[in-house]
A protein has these predicted regions:
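Active-site mouth loops of central-metabolism enzymes
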Residues: 50-64, 141-143
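Catalytic domains of carbohydrate-active enzymes, especially glycoside hydrolases
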Residues: 60, 64-85, 119, 290-294
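Glycine-rich, proline-tolerant flexible connector loops at the mouths of alpha/beta enzymes
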Residues: 84-98
Length: 470
């Protein structure tokens, strides 16, 4: 195995609503995430004063970021993915003037990262938007939200033009099909046509952000971000293969629009077959031509699908309810572990788009135990990440252009799916439980030193295979 390229970016990935806390400090408004105490798959709940959402404090990154950045630098990070909390900058979402205190926080954060030699990779909207845009406009179903997002994007592009050179528009934009409130601010019972119209507005907003970035920051790069993970046919029956193709297209269509600049023919047929009419203006079509510079994605699992709907309906155990693959092991949360699938996905996306790729989320959520001596022996996490990084290296050898890898997450954080601290991802243990109890003390896990060595050796310390099939 050859060393990873010298230009390869190594780091970790976080999100504002999973780490920052300080949910109403310094003028921040209420976001949609603040109304989802049970995670991205949970429904919107009215805010009950006095009842804490674990994300209100999260891991208190808002106040403790210097300590965390120092730990990331100790591991040798060259990149850290963060998101800007939109409601920190525009509390209601439709203000003309931004909240200076919110902007100043990210000034301080980016300065701290610069001093540590860590490049920021910044997501504009990571599973949240100002709740004011949902309450007063109806979320992304309203075309007016496009303009408010563009105003927000231009504001932060201008403010951080000398601090940030890598941007992402929407986190896992294709997740809106599974969690409409999380993705586009719509009620869970919204109809399919309404969801796709809201998605269209978001795709236009993403393209406008790309256009603005290219205009204001000619040296910067801006990408999209997809929830990645291939769907395999359950059997070799042609009908299962066709079903798998259609399921993969359901999420790849977002990348097709963002990377190719127009709706693909298969989606035109899908809309016809389902009696969906997308209201699209001529200016929308022009805006969509502003395509991303690179493709970024998360990768946690793969799954199977069958043409037999009775089998599909009985699928359970993971966030997307795919049929389990009998040849793969699963995590404690039912997410199937498929390192080879990452190599296949990287080659698939490279063949499809011929644009640089960036793995901006990948990791193992697990229940860690603190030993009597205070150590955390997370060999299972090391094995998981080792095997995935080996496959990334194989994809590079295949000729795939890969910009970097940011593990999810570099430090324990509030998990997105169900708002749990017990579902731990980090190289750094944070003393906090699902009830919000704990000192928030940071402790290096065994994987901390392992990842530092991987970065130092540019991957030459990786072992070929550590996870065997069941």
């Amino acid at each position: 195995m050859k060393a990873f390229p010298e230009t390869f970016l190594w780091g970790g990935a976080t999100a504002a609503n999973q780490v920052e806390g300080a949910w109403q400090e310094d003028g921040k408004g209420i976001s949609t995430s603040d109304l989802q105490p049970h995670g991205v798959m949970g429904k919107m709940e009215p805010r009950i004063l006095g009842k804490e959402n674990i994300k209100d404090v999260a891991i208190d990154f808002y106040h403790r970021y210097p300590e965390d950045i120092a730990l990331f630098a100790e591991m040798g990070f060259t990149c850290l993915r963060i998101s800007i909390a939109w409601a920190r900058i525009f509390p209601q979402g439709d203000e003309v003037e931004p909240n200076e205190a919110g902007l100043a926080f990210y000034d301080r954060l980016f300065d701290e990262m610069a001093q540590a030699g860590i490049k920021p990779l910044v997501t504009l909207s990571h599973y949240e938007m100002p709740y004011g845009l949902v309450k007063n406009y109806g979320g992304w179903a309203n075309r007016a939200v496009i303009d408010h997002f563009e105003h927000y994007a231009r504001t932060v592009f201008t403010r951080y033009q000398h601090r940030v050179a890598l941007w992402l528009t929407f986190n896992e934009i294709n997740m809106s099909l599974h969690a409409p409130f999380t993705g586009v601010g719509l009620a869970e019972e919204s109809g399919e046509a309404e969801v796709y119209q809201a998605i269209h507005h978001q795709l236009v907003a993403s393209a406008r952000a790309v256009k603005a970035c290219h205009s204001l920051l000619p040296e910067a790069k801006i990408g999209n971000m997809l929830l990645g993970g291939l769907v395999y046919p359950l059997t070799c029956q042609p009908q299962d293969m066709l079903q798998a193709m259609e399921e993969n297209r359901r999420w790849m269509f977002f990348g097709d629009v963002q990377a190719r600049g127009q709706y693909p023919g298969y989606m035109q047929r899908f809309f016809r077959d389902h009696n969906i009419t997308i209201e699209m203006t001529e200016s929308d079509a022009e805006d969509l031509k502003h395509t991303v510079d690179f493709i970024s994605f998360s990768y946690y699992m793969t799954g199977c699908v069958s043409h037999d709907e009775s089998i599909n309906k009985n699928a359970q155990g993971n966030i997307l309810n795919m049929i389990p693959n009998p040849h793969l092991k699963s995590s404690e949360w039912g997410w199937q572990i498929d390192p080879v699938g990452l190599r296949v996905l990287l080659n698939t996306l490279w063949d499809r788009y011929q644009k640089p790729l960036f793995i901006v989320e990948n990791g193992l959520g697990a229940k860690d135990s603190v030993e009597a001596d205070g150590s955390i022996q997370d060999d299972y996490r090391i094995a998981y990440l080792n095997d995935h990084l080996v496959q990334v290296n194989e994809a590079i050898a295949d000729g795939v252009d890969i910009m970097g890898y940011t593990s999810r997450g570099p430090i324990d954080l509030v998990s997105a799916s169900h708002s749990q601290m017990s579902k731990r991802y980090g190289f750094i243990y944070v003393d906090r439980d699902d009830n919000g109890e704990g000192s928030l003390t940071r402790t290096r896990k065994k994987s901390f030193g392992w990842y530092a060595e991987v970065i130092k050796t540019r991957g030459l310390s990786l072992k070929k295979i550590t996870i065997k099939a069941p």
